[in-house]
């Protein structure tokens, strides 16, 4: 139980979020954006006729769609914060950051693909779908991201699929630390997805 001891202070701090969520004074509230990934500047250009990977909007469990930060206070209880909210649509933020990371990945043959969201009507390519059932803080001082991903080929067949499970320790108490931890967890998740997708995508003529 050394891990439990390590996060003892953080557990208390995360449980304090429940008190913050119940406060009615604006001073306790906040609106938060996910931290930007540091890879945005590393995105590379690819050939206009390169094969396409479409990234579907990240799907969220219904309780994550309300705009509130969510944390788990014990084994069975989830609490939605009433005063501490996402400043932008969570689905949009997660999808944008996933796109950024996939575009920046050096993994072959992924780096030879055009990567875009599904707004490019009329184009058809491989398709990545991601669904999350947990994007929360937890009473043991960690943020938790869990879900599933699936990669389909141009013909709709499943090329690969798998689970998502990323645990990231909080470095401090409070909502800002929770947001930073979730942001780091999503960055790590994006890197893991890029590696797994690269293994499953068909090679391109330019891939070495």
Model-derived features: where do they sit?
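Sec-exported extracytoplasmic/periplasmic mature domains
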Residues: 99, 103-107, 194-198, 202
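Soluble periplasmic/extracytoplasmic beta-strand elements of cell-envelope proteins
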Residues: 52-58, 70, 127-131, 144-150, ...
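A structural "domain/chain start" motif
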Residues: 23-92, 200-208
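Sec-dependent bacterial lipoprotein signal peptides
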Residues: 1-23
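Structured, soluble extracytoplasmic/luminal domains of envelope-associated proteins
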Residues: 84-106
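Surface-exposed short loop/turn segments
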Residues: 24-42, 105-155
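Short secondary-structure boundary motifs at beta->alpha junctions and helix caps
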Residues: 77-85, 155-195
């Amino acid at each position: 139980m050394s891990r439990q001891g390590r996060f003892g202070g953080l557990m208390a701090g995360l449980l304090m979020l429940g008190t913050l969520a119940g406060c009615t004074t604006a001073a306790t509230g906040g609106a938060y954006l996910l931290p930007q990934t540091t890879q945005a500047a590393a995105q590379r250009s690819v050939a206009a006729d390169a094969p396409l990977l479409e990234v579907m909007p990240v799907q969220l469990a219904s309780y994550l769609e309300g705009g509130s930060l969510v944390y788990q206070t014990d084994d069975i209880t989830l609490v939605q914060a009433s005063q501490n909210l996402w400043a932008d649509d969570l689905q949009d933020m997660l999808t944008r950051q996933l796109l950024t990371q996939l575009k920046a990945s050096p993994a072959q043959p992924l780096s030879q693909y055009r990567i875009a969201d599904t707004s490019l009507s009329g184009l058809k390519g491989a398709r990545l779908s991601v669904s999350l059932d947990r994007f929360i803080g937890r009473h043991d001082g960690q943020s938790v991201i869990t879900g599933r991903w699936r990669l389909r080929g141009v013909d709709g067949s499943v090329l690969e699929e798998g689970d998502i499970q990323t645990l990231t320790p909080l470095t401090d108490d409070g909502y800002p630390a929770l947001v930073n931890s979730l942001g780091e967890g999503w960055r790590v998740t994006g890197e893991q997805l890029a590696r797994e997708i690269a293994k499953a995508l068909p090679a391109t003529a330019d891939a070495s």
